Amino acid sequence: MKKIIAMLLVLVMSVTGLAGCGSSKGNEAGSTSAGSDSDWAYIQDKGKLTVGITLFAPMNYYNEKNKLVGFDTEMAEAVTKKLGIDVEFTEINWDSKEVELSSKNIDCIWNGMCITEERKQNMSISDPYLYNTQAMVMKKSREKEIMKSVKGLTVTAEQGSTGEGKIDGSIADDDTVKVSAQDYFKDANYVASDSMAKALMEVKSGTADVALVDSVCALGMVGEGTDYSDLVINMDNNFGQQEYGIAFRKGSDVTEKVNEAIKELYEDGTVDTIAKKYGLQEMLIK
């Protein structure tokens, strides 16, 4: 079922224009101008790339052995190995990611981040690497009821996320959107969650009726054999298409270094191998 949903997602995106996702809050990420020290030289000097993340499968999460794994985790490890530096992962509050980047607490945001025009103005963004859209997640036993009407129900999304931006109207819709999330949920009660994983937990516990999360997150965390086997993914409503990218400080010369490294990892088959491991091969942007 998940594979079918993923294939349908890619099919829709291949024939439509892609729009940005996610709201950008906080200060502009500090720039690296031609007259200042190279960001790459700064990272080489300290010997590591500090990556800002939040925890959600299949991008960055801890497995049963308490080891940090995931598609973005393994890609960052492969890229930094090719660049000859170490990698360090740091958990951040998603709503303050730009501040963490500009203050140099982290060197990049590599965590299923949607590309938007606003973010491209404030940060240096890598080439897109994965397709994404928004998915409604709810209890299986209540799917028919909820899809009939969300009036008076509680909907949740990660604070600062695409889902929240779609619900509050701060994220513009593209031509593929038939009904905006803002209109769809106008008669529902909105409550923000600290992360997409916590949004799913709210639905599982019954505190919320619906979670609006990235489809990549939903496909990786919901269904048989997961902690959310009693939940179901519904993408009947198209709230727009997005692409994931990696964010660096504005003007950073590290962006192109990473783009080139990823290109080489595509050529030697590493990207396909990692994507297959996490069931994301159908969503790769090649």
Question: Where does each model-flagged region fall?
Answer:
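Bacterial lipoprotein signal-peptidase II cleavage site
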Residues: 17-32
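Extracytoplasmic small-molecule ligand-binding "clamshell" domains
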Residues: 29-112, 268, 277
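Hydrophobic/proline-rich hinge and linker segments of small-molecule sensing/allosteric domains
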Residues: 50-54, 125-146, 247-250
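Ligand-binding cleft/hinge of the Venus flytrap
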Residues: 76-85, 163-192, 222-227
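Short helices/loops that flank or line small-molecule/ion binding pockets
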Residues: 82, 90-91, 95-109, 122-124, ...
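A ligand-binding cleft/hinge motif common to bilobed small-molecule-binding domains
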Residues: 113-121, 167-170, 201-240
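Periplasmic-binding protein-like
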Residues: 131-138, 215, 219-263, 279-286
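Flexible hinge/capping segments at coil-to-helix
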Residues: 138-159, 174
